Amino acid sequence: MQTTGALLISPALIRSCTRGLIRPVSASFLSRPEIPSVQPSYSSGPLQVARREFQTSVVSRDIDTAAKFIGAGAATVGVAGSGAGIGTVFGSLIIGYARNPSLKQQLFSYAILGFALSEAMGLFCLMVAFLILFAM
């Protein structure tokens, strides 16, 4: 069995571990620009501009890519819903025409309106999927 003295943690260790947790997010993710100690000569070439960039690892880029593909796949499900909606609209048109043939013109205009709305929602879902893939 271990003694309780081995399980105790020194206060210096706690301070050094929690110092990284207290830092602001911008200081944690942004790299600091390198400041040269020697002044460059102006005749040696173009001046280097210090830039701050996000530090991203390969793992986080892979996670971002996977999230993009999952989001685009979820948005594409709406296109299948559009196909089901169009089938429902024209199936209802046939049933309505079989029940009351005298309303043929009014039923057809409603069916065209339902087709247009269902198709618009399918195209909107497809557009969102392409935006997720190629614009983000």
Curated annotation (Swiss-Prot):
Q: Does the keyword Glycoprotein apply?
A: no
InterPro entries documented for this protein: ATP_synth_F0_csu (IPR000454), ATP_synth_F0_csu_DDCD_BS (IPR020537), ATP_synth_F0_csu_sf (IPR038662), ATPase_proteolipid_c-like_dom (IPR002379), F/V-ATP_Csub_sf (IPR035921)
PROSITE patterns on file? ATPASE_C (PS00605)
Q: MF terms per GO, please?
A: lipid binding; proton channel activity
TM regions (residue ranges): 77-97, 112-132
Q: Which reactions are catalysed by this chain?
A: H(+)(in) = H(+)(out)
Alphabetically list the UniProt keywords.
CF(0), Hydrogen ion transport, Ion transport, Lipid-binding, Membrane, Methylation, Mitochondrion, Transit peptide, Transmembrane, Transmembrane helix, Transport
Q: In terms of one coarse class, where is the protein primarily found?
A: mitochondrion
In the UniProt record, the transit peptide is located at 1-61
Q: Where is this site: Reversibly protonated during proton transport?
A: 119
Record GO biological process: proton motive force-driven ATP synthesis; proton transmembrane transport
Q: What's the protein's topology in the membrane?
A: Multi-pass membrane protein
Subcellular location field: Mitochondrion membrane
Q: Which residues carry this modification: N6,N6,N6-trimethyllysine?
A: 104
What does this gene product do?
A: Subunit c, of the mitochondrial membrane ATP synthase complex (F(1)F(0) ATP synthase or Complex V) that produces ATP from ADP in the presence of a proton gradient across the membrane which is generated by electron transport complexes of the respiratory chain. ATP synthase complex consist of a soluble F(1) head domain - the catalytic core - and a membrane F(1) domain - the membrane proton channel. These two domains are linked by a central stalk rotating inside the F(1) region and a stationary peripheral stalk.
Q: Which PANTHER family match?
A: ATP SYNTHASE F(0) COMPLEX SUBUNIT C1, MITOCHONDRIAL, ATP SYNTHASE LIPID-BINDING PROTEIN, MITOCHONDRIAL
Q: Which family does it belong to?
A: Belongs to the ATPase C chain family.
> What is the name of this protein?
ATP synthase F(0) complex subunit C1, mitochondrial
